């Protein structure tokens, strides 16, 4: 099937990058949000991947970069919508927040004529989440706070639980959603969504990145978007938790 993002039609079997307009800087430079679209040759669901809603969280950017190299339109059933950097302002300034100190991941679903946070959230909600069936949002810990690779999700939802099991992170946390987050909005719209946390801000962590790429591939396989892999000799189930705490 054909999918339309930012006014650009992408046919089956195609790979395209679309620049969604975000805003202009005070220098009149156009600022855009690149969306990587891999539209499979075969019919199937649409899966979104978002990263860097907080501009200083880098692991997800590299996860998406590596994942896009592994996924081919020839073998994909459905469509992959990937945004490596949602908070482009924060990324350029190595900041968690937007210039007005708003937290983008407390601004969903946003609105078309609101603050810059509301406008970016609205853009993601209407152009990406609205067209998707499933998704995953990639995050890291804050500066000087390192997160063990973990999945946060509503594990009472059987589809979400199936996705979390397939991802295979060391820990899966049955975590309540927070108001205004992307995961809350997507879940409310009926889009089963995982949140992957790994590592710390402003750092690349190779272990976390590899685990993220492998995990997303496994989720795409269990959703039958990618061909099944040979059975693993050893299958390690995640440890399930209902709460977390920081070790200082």
Functional labels for PLM-detected ranges:
Residues 1-248:
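Structured catalytic-domain cores with a bias toward divalent-metal coordination
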């Amino acid at each position: 099937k054909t999918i339309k993002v930012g006014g650009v039609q992408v046919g089956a079997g195609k790979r395209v990058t679309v620049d969604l307009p975000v805003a202009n800087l005070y220098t009149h430079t156009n600022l855009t949000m690149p969306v990587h679209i891999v539209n499979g040759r075969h019919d199937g669901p649409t899966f979104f991947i978002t990263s860097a809603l907080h501009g200083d969280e880098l692991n997800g950017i590299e996860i998406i970069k590596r994942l896009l190299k592994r996924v081919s339109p020839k073998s994909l059933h459905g469509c992959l919508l990937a945004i490596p950097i949602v908070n482009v302002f924060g990324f350029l300034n190595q900041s968690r927040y937007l210039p007005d100190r708003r937290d983008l991941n407390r601004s969903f679903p946003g609105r078309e004529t609101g603050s810059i946070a509301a406008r970016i959230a609205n853009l993601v909600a209407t152009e990406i989440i609205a067209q998707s069936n499933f998704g995953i949002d990639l995050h890291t810990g804050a500066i000087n706070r390192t997160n063990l690779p973990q999945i946060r999700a509503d594990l009472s939802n059987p589809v979400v639980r199936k996705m979390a099991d397939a991802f295979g992170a060391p820990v899966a946390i049955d975590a309540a959603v927070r108001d205004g987050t992307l995961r809350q909005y997507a879940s409310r719209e009926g889009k089963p969504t995982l949140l992957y946390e790994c590592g710390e801000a402003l750092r690349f962590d190779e272990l976390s990145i590899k685990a993220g790429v492998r995990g997303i591939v496994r989720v795409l396989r269990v959703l039958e978007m990618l061909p099944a892999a040979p059975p693993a000799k050893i299958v390690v189930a995640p440890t399930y938790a209902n709460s977390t705490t920081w070790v200082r």
